[in-house]
Amino acid sequence: MTKNVLVSVAWPYANGPRHIGHVAGFGVPSDVFARFQRMSGNNVLMVSGTDEHGTPLLVQADKEGVTVQDLADKYNRQIVEDLTGLGLSYDLFTRTTTSNHYAVVQELFRGLYDNGYMIKETTLGAISPSTGRTLPDRYIEGTCPICGTDGARGDQCDNCGNQLDPADLINPVSKINGETPEFVETEHFLLDLPALAEALTEWLKGREDWRPNVLKFSLNLLDDIRPRAMSRDIDWGIPIPVEGWQDNNAKKLYVWFDAVVGYLSASIEWAYRSGDPEAWRTFWNDPETKSYYFMGKDNITFHSQIWPAELLGYAGKGSRGGEIGDLGVLNLPTEVVSSEFLTMSGSKFSSSKGVVIYVKDFLKEFGPDALRYFIAVAGPENNDTDFTWDEFVRRVNNELANGWGNLVNRTVSMAHKNFGEVPVPGALEESDKKILDLATAAFESVAANLDQSKFKAGISEIMHVVGEANAYIAEQEPWKLAKDDTKRERLATVLWTALQVVSDCNTMLTPYLPHTAQKVHETLGRDGIWAATPQIVEVTNESPRQPIGVGLPDPEHTYPVIMGDYKTQLAKWQRIDVVPGTTLEKPAPLIAKLDPELGETGPEWAPVQN
């Protein structure tokens, strides 16, 4: 039975190019999942975009001496190019500075406001004494007043998991310039989380199939739930759609209020650009639809508490009741799939400290699938993981090149050399049946892992089949069979068996290694697009909905989006029979081995730090 599956991917912040730590958390896992779901015959919508509001973007624009819109345009395009190069198969990757996004965000806010879940209060806001600019919560650090840990942020303490306000911190300082922030009274709208706590608790306690770290963290947040400010004193953001506020260019909606609405607004934009403006409702209003949210662990709060609270309040499901908004009852997340951090030499990736490997540099030298493979087998799925060049070289050479690449090349080479085509097999022996049965069984078990976002377990099982297939060839010694004319039928059977297992493994590796999978598809003498790739499309800021207020996006503005025609690809999650008589050409090397010295030195653009 076909399922509708929404894959919502965390929105990268557009204040710089992406490094591999970013895509290890939100990028590759979500794409493996989406590609697998499509291959399984499900109706998939995968959306994301660049997050372009908030103080950090203003700070970066000042550093680069450009307008904030120019900065957003610059990094939006860079990120689009990086993610397209990595092969992330978005149905739409857009941005938050669009008229459509502004309008959808304002609709969500109005629904919450009308239902009584947006309350107006006077709070203490942090500003920079030297610039007068508002300091975002995450740009203030100090000692946690609850557990005493240094380095707690103004929104939460990563050590104890409690939500904080900047004014709660002991000895708060600005991360931008180290100065002590000044706290002033200011009026803001707060999301009344306590009024939604009971509904949130009931929903979360039904999420028993979530990753344990995500569920535990999310439930702990309920112990200290409090109203949370959803507006800011800033001139760069979405106008607050309330009379007396919408034309005040000094107050805008909080960047995290608008960013999580992006999953919905991107779905609406996708439907509009696809020619069926109501198609988004399949993924948001149908309660049978499954929705999965992919991100790094630092974003759990916003996806397991803030976003669900917004959805519940919009539908009038909190203690204050309320009416269902114009967009209808919107689906809550089926699962929040959070990854841990990918570090480098034991430290978090940091552009300012030079602890960084940019995606664009990596793609230029090594291509996309080497990085996709490393993240799949050694990424931070359940624990923080350290990236080292030594491990990267080792895994590419020993597993990808010597394992998978060797299996493909020697199998197809021997079949080409001895038959010029896929040979006709004779009667299968027990050894042939055993390896074929192993590959057959892997389809079901790998699928079960991928359906539960257990990507490491999935690829480990596939690579086990690859290893057993290489052992099968070593045991059967087809190069010896080729020297004996009386063994020609046995040679044909062994090579046909090996070709079938290559085909099976290639199918199962497709979500992980789509670019390599297309090459193997062609190496096996097959035509057509096996694994579709995303495309960059230039669009204009057209919108089916119009926002209100001041500081709105230019309706004539053009920008790049990522889209793709994935429904026409041939890849299916099932055995594709290798057909005797199919012409085979001599294969080119599938995966280039890396110089072992690279593991000791790293490349010039990201050398090993001694």
Swiss-Prot record:
GO terms for biological process: methionyl-tRNA aminoacylation. GO terms for molecular function: ATP binding; metal ion binding; methionine-tRNA ligase activity. It comes from the Bacteria. Its EC number is 6.1.1.10. It holds the Pfam family Anticodon_3. One of its GO terms (cellular component) is cytosol. Binds 1 zinc ion per subunit. Keywords: Aminoacyl-tRNA synthetase, ATP-binding, Cytoplasm, Ligase, Metal-binding, Nucleotide-binding, Protein biosynthesis, Zinc. It is an enzyme of class 6 (ligase). Zn(2+) binds at residues 144, 147, 157, 160. It catalyses: tRNA(Met) + L-methionine + ATP = L-methionyl-tRNA(Met) + AMP + diphosphate. Monomer. Belongs to the class-I aminoacyl-tRNA synthetase family. MetG type 1 subfamily. Is required not only for elongation of protein synthesis but also for the initiation of all mRNA translation through initiator tRNA(fMet) aminoacylation. This is Methionine--tRNA ligase. It comes from Corynebacterium glutamicum (strain ATCC 13032 / DSM 20300 / JCM 1318 / BCRC 11384 / CCUG 27702 / LMG 3730 / NBRC 12168 / NCIMB 10025 / NRRL B-2784 / 534). The gene is metG.
